[in-house]
């Protein structure tokens, strides 16, 4: 404004995802410079935004994602940062590239978009700026929330449940595992059909209608329900077959041992080390979904059956709960459980609690258990220890201050440091390095052949 109060120029600003500040302020223009109208400027800005959208489409091949976590201000249990780290690991398993993360603490979620509108817009601008094409929320979104956020963001939005379903679908190998995952996916989809709109064509393409007045949505719901029914029938048949196999093993009177633990605790690596087998043991969450069974032979021609199982996880999605528990049903016939714990994980105590909670829900907490604290080679304190081999070639560890023996004092000290009862049925191992396996096998043999059922069977034979 000049001294007379008349305009002598103007400034303009607009959102700009390509700028570090997410906006741009244009230079001041004077009345004599107004050769273009405001409309032309707006069209130029929209053209630049369109180019950003093109870059976004090019990025879709990389599965670039932005993670969003909304947690109560005073959360009980796991710290939000640990929950977000687990979500990152889930993304890595699903081959999703995490570009950035966002954590907000608030006690009341926005019923329509979870986050407040302003915060959501900030995230969307940042996502466009970094060429992100996927938002992953660390909670289960309602169908209306997912649709609302996707409409506002104009990019794909999924929640933790969908991510886990995708991982299960990738990793299931057996017929039973694949059917369980498909059933879980369909049950998840069924409750969200009313929100799918344009996506319905993918579900109903090529399917004939029930009648001239039936909509695509009605066709979709009916077909999903029919498929769910068929899957449940087939899964019941497979369950009967598994029961027959378990009865056969019982008749052979071979002791059964089940390995349980949080996902990525190293269960498959542990079983591989014990049995010299080659079960897939990637450093990813849910690398194992289908139960795997092997045999271990002890002296005096004594054998046991030992089985690996799917890893446990916090807050398992309801749609996967039945599928997950079905894969664990064989644990009910176990004479002994082996709980493998990743002791190097800062969240390991809460992970142990999650496993124990699920075992209680499955009514398996009465089964005797050995705890295996795995990955001790990742502990900073352990890196100063020596590695030795006994006369049979088994690797053991000792503290530098101990010149002879397997380092029992140092192990006892470390157990005490970790809050483990020195006299409890707990062993420290590194399955990856092969350390501590002899101590585990000795304890396993002692426990398994002192079980009441086995003593009774031996007495009967005598």
Swiss-Prot record:
Keywords annotated in UniProt: Cytoplasm, GTP-binding, Magnesium, Metal-binding, Nucleotide-binding
Cellular component per GO, a single term: cytoplasm
Predominant place of localization: cytoplasm
A Pfam family this chain is assigned to: GTP-bdg_N
Gene3D superfamilies in the record: 6.10.250.2860, GTPase HflX, N-terminal domain, P-loop containing nucleotide triphosphate hydrolases
The keyword Metal-binding is assigned to this record: yes
Positions with a binding annotation for GTP: 261-268, 286-290, 308-311, 374-377, 430-432
Compartments in which it is found: Cytoplasm
Cofactor: Mg(2+)
GO MF annotation terms: GTP binding; GTPase activity; metal ion binding; ribosome binding
Binding residues for Mg(2+): 268, 288
Listed transmembrane segments: none
Domain of life: Bacteria
Hflx-type G domain span: 255-452
Description of how the protein assembles with itself and partners: Monomer. Associates with the 50S ribosomal subunit.
Similarity comment: Belongs to the TRAFAC class OBG-HflX-like GTPase superfamily. HflX GTPase family.
PANTHER family: GTP-BINDING PROTEIN 6-RELATED, GTP-BINDING PROTEIN HFLX
Annotated NCBIfam families: GTP_HflX (TIGR03156), small_GTP (TIGR00231)
Function: GTPase that associates with the 50S ribosomal subunit and may have a role during protein synthesis or ribosome biogenesis.
The protein's name: GTPase HflX
Annotated source species: Leptospira borgpetersenii serovar Hardjo-bovis (strain JB197)
